[in-house]
From Swiss-Prot:
Annotated positions of the N6-(pyridoxal phosphate)lysine modification: 92
Gene3D superfamilies assigned: 3.40.50.1100
Name of the protein in its database record: Tryptophan synthase beta chain
PROSITE patterns reported in the protein's UniProt record: TRP_SYNTHASE_BETA
Gene from which the chain derives: trpB
Record organism: Vesicomyosocius okutanii subsp. Calyptogena okutanii (strain HA)
Lineage of the species this protein comes from: Bacteria, Pseudomonadati, Pseudomonadota, Gammaproteobacteria, Candidatus Pseudothioglobaceae
Named cofactor requirement(s): pyridoxal 5'-phosphate
Keyword Lyase (UniProt): yes
């Protein structure tokens, strides 16, 4: 039995989380809260979710011993949780399956979503196609340009992709537009948020659907090695892949937990040069919950930067804010340059192309492995595959595709 029982009934992780939304959204949020409370322990719902994870998404994903990388570093032994091998290419499908099944039970016929890197958009469009639901995806104009492959995939799946031209034209603005849509179409629309942000119950619900990552990794490590790993590493934008890995280990205090944010051009260059609210932000309210965010003294959101579209978000899930303050997890930041280097290292040494988001975790995992001895072990969450980033990397490095 876990000693960790957050959030409370009102969605609070101590002083973080909660429900901070306009009155016009209250009905929809409380309808969702009641529905999730009703179905999350329902045996038929759980069975259908687990069967879809197995037979549709392709779970369980492997825990792969990165022998070549471990040997090269001469430090800790590195294991990769291969979420990149899921159907659609990332961890995002775990959550979209769960929320789409809930939407069907609530009688909703239309699905909306926001997306940055496009992986959540693809995963949402995928489950919507399978369940016969209308699908609309909001995506920042900047992200549409740098993730054109995923835009095409969403359209092939039958989704309508709406470029968002307001603000920084990235993930934050996509989430804003999706919420505006939801307000106007409450009766027939279900909003599938892709990360552990938003008002309660989203941070809890998305965590619960993603927690399969850590449950599997814990059992797999025990079977392959015995005992527990010494450390966990995962990238953090909103933070769903990270909490998916971390959650099963929170009570295991011998396991060190590291979340890795996007340092972009460098933390020292100011808030517009990175996307690292836990490392260099302050506390405020964003997208319906209290958390760490990138904001100025007047409470205005500062637009940040990351080479990875999925990390380019000015806030973070409230559970990560709590884990930071409580000291249970530590949060680091990796620059664009370091992430690119890690991308090439893993690709050339292990034959695995990680997403640029995941490359941030790989980069810090490499640093950590060098500090630890050979008798130590690290699990790195490889949250997605890097096919979507090939053109971005080629453009940066001046390579013709």
């Amino acid at each position: 039995m876990s000693n960790y029982n957050l959030p409370d009934d009102n969605g609070h992780f101590d002083k973080y989380g909660g429900i901070f939304i306009a009155e016009t959204l209250m009905t929809a949020v409380f309808e969702l809260k009641d529905a999730y409370a009703r179905f999350k322990n329902d045996s038929k719902f759980i069975c259908e979710f687990e069967q879809d994870l197995k037979h549709y998404a392709g779970r369980e994903t492997p825990l792969y011993y990165a022998k070549n990388l471990s040997k090269k570093l001469r430090g800790a032994q590195i294991y990769l949780k291969r979420e990149d091998l899921n159907h659609t290419g990332s961890h995002k499908i775990n959550n979209t399956i769960g929320q789409a099944l809930l939407a069907k039970r609530m009688g909703k016929t239309r699905i909306i979503a926001e997306t940055g890197a496009g992986q959540h958009g693809v995963a949402t469009a995928t489950v919507a196609a399978r369940l016969g639901l209308e699908c609309v995806v909001y995506m920042g104009e900047v992200d549409v340009a740098r993730q054109s492959l995923n835009v095409f995939r969403m359209k092939l799946l039958g989704a309508k992709v709406i470029p968002v031209t307001s603000g920084s034209k990235t993930l934050k603005d996509s989430l804003n537009e999706a919420m505006r849509d939801w307000v106007k179409n409450i009766d027939d629309t279900f909003y599938i948020i892709g990360t552990i942000a938003g008002p309660h119950p989203y941070p809890m619900m998305v965590r619960d659907f993603q927690s399969i990552i850590g449950k599997e990794a814990k059992a797999q490590f025990h079977d392959q090695v015995g005992g527990l790993p010494d450390a966990l590493v995962a990238c953090v934008g909103g933070g769903s892949n990270a909490i998916g890995l971390f959650y099963a280990f929170i009570d295991n205090v011998s396991v060190e937990i590291y979340g890795v944010e996007a340092a972009g051009h460098g933390l020292e260059k100011g808030p517009s040069a990175h996307a690292a609210p836990l490392c260099a932000g302050n506390v405020g309210v964003l997208h319906g919950n209290r958390t760490y965010l990138m904001g100025d003294e007047n409470g205005q959101i500062i637009e940040g930067h990351s080479i990875a579209a999925g990390l380019d978000y000015p806030g973070v899930g409230p559970e990560h804010a709590y884990l930071k303050d409580s000291g249970r997890a530590q949060y680091m930041a990796i620059t664009d340059k370091e992430a690119l280097e890690a991308f090439h290292i893993l690709t050339k040494i292990e034959g695995i192309l990680p997403a640029l988001e995941s490359s941030h975790a790989v980069a810090y995992g490499i640093k950590l492995a060098k500090k630890l001895g050979k008798n130590k072990s690290i699990i790195i969450n490889l949250s997605g595959r890097g096919d979507k980033d090939i053109h971005t990397i080629a453009q940066i490095e001046g390579i013709e595709c």
